[in-house]
């Protein structure tokens, strides 16, 4: 084990990359429970307006919003399900916010904690894109991450599930990018080179392999 760690640190010394930044939602937090609760809240709020919505309709509205790179996916879904009627959309949106505003459904992705430990043991600096740091503390993983990376963007690898919110800005800043296809954004596909990640993964094992490839590149 010690020889493995020393070998990994030697690899890092030769690499341009010093840090890995994780967008927590999707890559670290599965978000399955959150997405199910949100979709249920949207259906319930529509029902209170007399709009009958089934899971297939919610899934279709979600897919349309994701494919269109909608800046506010929830609003886009509600607009689709409510036929775009402004006052109805506003009421449904308020109800959904009331139903989900205090919801905290953090689900640590299986295997990700062990990967974080291995990456840190290799000498990589780990960053977290997560506005609610207490969620990481409750999940027992806050200690893996630093508040201030102190690493130039060109020395960073970004792992995120969304092309629009994660991959595009990271590429623009000069980071290497890995799309973790999961949950609501698993079907999002790039429309141009600027939206295309350096790699795509669907599980933790693939993620670790790609990170090592980038470090070795």
Language model regions located:
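Asp-based, Mg2+/Mn2+-dependent phosphohydrolase catalytic module
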Residues: 1-20, 33, 87, 113, ...
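N-terminal helical cap/lid subdomain that shapes the substrate entry/recognition surface
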Residues: 4-114, 118-122, 130-134
């Amino acid at each position: 084990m010690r020889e493995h760690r020393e070998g990994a640190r030697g690899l890092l010394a030769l690499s341009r990359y010093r840090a890995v930044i994780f967008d927590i939602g999707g890559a670290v937090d599965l978000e399955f429970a959150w997405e199910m609760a949100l979709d249920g809240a949207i259906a319930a709020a529509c029902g209170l307006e007399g709009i009958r919505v089934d899971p297939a309709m919610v899934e279709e509205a979600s897919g349309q919003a994701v494919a269109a790179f909608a800046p506010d996916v929830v609003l886009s879904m509600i607009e689709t399900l409510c036929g775009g009627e402004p006052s109805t959309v506003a009421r449904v949106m308020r109800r959904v916010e009331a139903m989900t505003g205090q919801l905290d459904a953090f689900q640590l992705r299986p295997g990700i904690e062990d990967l974080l430990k291995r990456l840190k043991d290799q000498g990589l600096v780990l960053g977290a894109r997560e506005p609610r740091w207490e969620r990481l503390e409750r999940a027992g993983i806050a200690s893996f991450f630093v508040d201030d990376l102190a690493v130039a963007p060109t020395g960073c690898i970004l792992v995120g599930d969304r092309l629009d919110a994660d991959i595009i800005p990271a590429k623009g800043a000069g980071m290497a990018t890995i799309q973790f296809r999961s949950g609501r954004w698993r079907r999002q596909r790039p429309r141009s080179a600027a939206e295309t990640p350096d790699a795509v993964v669907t599980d933790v094992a693939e993620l670790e392999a790609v990170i090592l490839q980038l470090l070795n590149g």
